Amino acid sequence: MEIINSLLDKIYDSTFPETCRARLSDAIRETRDALTHPRKAHWDEKDVVLITYADQFRESEAPTLRTFSRFYQQHLQSSFSLVHLLPFFPYSSDDGFSVIDYHHVSAICGDWSDVAELHQHTRLMFDFVCNHISSHSAWFKHYLAMDPGWDDFFISMPPATDLSGVTRPRTSPLLTPFEMADGDTRFIWTTFSADQIDLNFANPFVLLSMVDVLLDYLAKGADYIRLDAVGYMWKTPGTSCIHLEKTHQLVKLFRAIADEVAPGTVIITETNVPHKDNISYLGNGRDEAQMVYNFSLPPLVLHAIHYGSARALKQWAASLGVGSGTTTFFNFLASHDGIGLNPLRGILPETEIVSLVRDLAAEGALISWKNNPDGTASPYEINVTYMDALNKKEDDDDTRLQRFMLAHALLLAFPGVPAVYVQSILGSRNDMEGVKVAGHNRAINREKYAISEIEAALSDRKSLRHRVYHALSALIQLRIRQPAFHPDNPMEVLESDNALLVLSRPVKKHDALLCIYNLSGREMTYSLPENQRYRNINNDERVEGDVPVRLAPWGWLWLKR
């Protein structure tokens, strides 16, 4: 508790009430003493994460978590050792990220017993939506009713307050008017939408309430805790209100509580920002998040395949450095959100980012924008399935599959823990009808299915879904058998033509896995080190080092020395 108490003093400038401190200490101790589920001590090459909604599949009147559990056991368990269940709580908007009640499971998904049943078959990652809560929540209703004890739970500002320096991830107003019980209007801080009300962590009782949520998730067995939109948690008018020091201290506090209650729990921060700011949430390697999303990877892989050049990807990959052993990257290509562009800024010139946006928009992708402090707007996200991002409308399925598998062979070779979005393992295309129905761009990559529809598609040998599912499942299962892909193993980027990316993942001093990728649409060759023999682990064929290897368009090889 010493670390926890020290952080409380830093966050609240030594004014944290002793009654709150005692309550917090009691809650931590009670949760720790009641916990029976041990966490995995450390990550390894066998860890691959599936990202999915809890209501991804429907089956008559059955709770969707039960349907998912059956599908997972039949089709996914051999590939994925951990499931990230996107928010499965009652919500009012944003497909789960405007939570009405943190402590209950949405009725359509089931209840906590269904979560526990799934947990018998896989480790689980929960979302801790810690920056904001739904305007339909009991907490906000108490606030609007002006009930005693709720006055400072949220942040109100005079509408004339100069907040021009605040970093904005959206084009919606930062302050939203709400009528209070006495008839007055207050303008409330809403970073993401009028329905998502920012919590006021400067109020110690807000912290206590949110720590209760964290402890509940730990008690329910969460192995990974994802801190959603965490960069915006602490607000100080006159600043950018992102990545503030007290925000980092809050993350450190959540980490310290998880370490105290359930050692081995992984804290992962979701900060879709430039790379330098993103990795700042790893702290000193032992005191903040254990993982950060590798947000630069999805747009850089897309950029490389789109233009047939690994130049930018190669330079960035060479700068990643060696993992500390106590922190690592959460690598992914697609998720429930779009492909973020902010993580490209500082890596690619703005002209190249805009060019990529225009090219993909011409092929049917949707673009989301953010407001800048100078009054301009910039593209911040490309909304598209990763399958359609990589390909043109007129491409055939053979080409689609080739590019898609190239991208995922890259994903699975990078240092870190890889994660695959459910729409990717299912080979999904853009859901334009879903966008019309939902009225927002992100619905393009969030389609939900009748379980019978998906199982029929996976049984159809000619369907793209069948081909993607079997090819990607086989690739993941090959990956988890390679000790070279342990997240903590170093990676070396080797010299090559800019159309190629060549990575070496050493296991021992004279043993390495060589990963060679052709990002272009033309055949390429690569000269291996002479006097070396390799084995192609994809087909078990021997490869002699004195003969250049040929790579088909968008082809790749994993060679074991």
Model region roles, listed by residue range:
Residues 1-532, 538-561:
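Active-site and adjacent substrate-binding regions of carbohydrate-active enzymes
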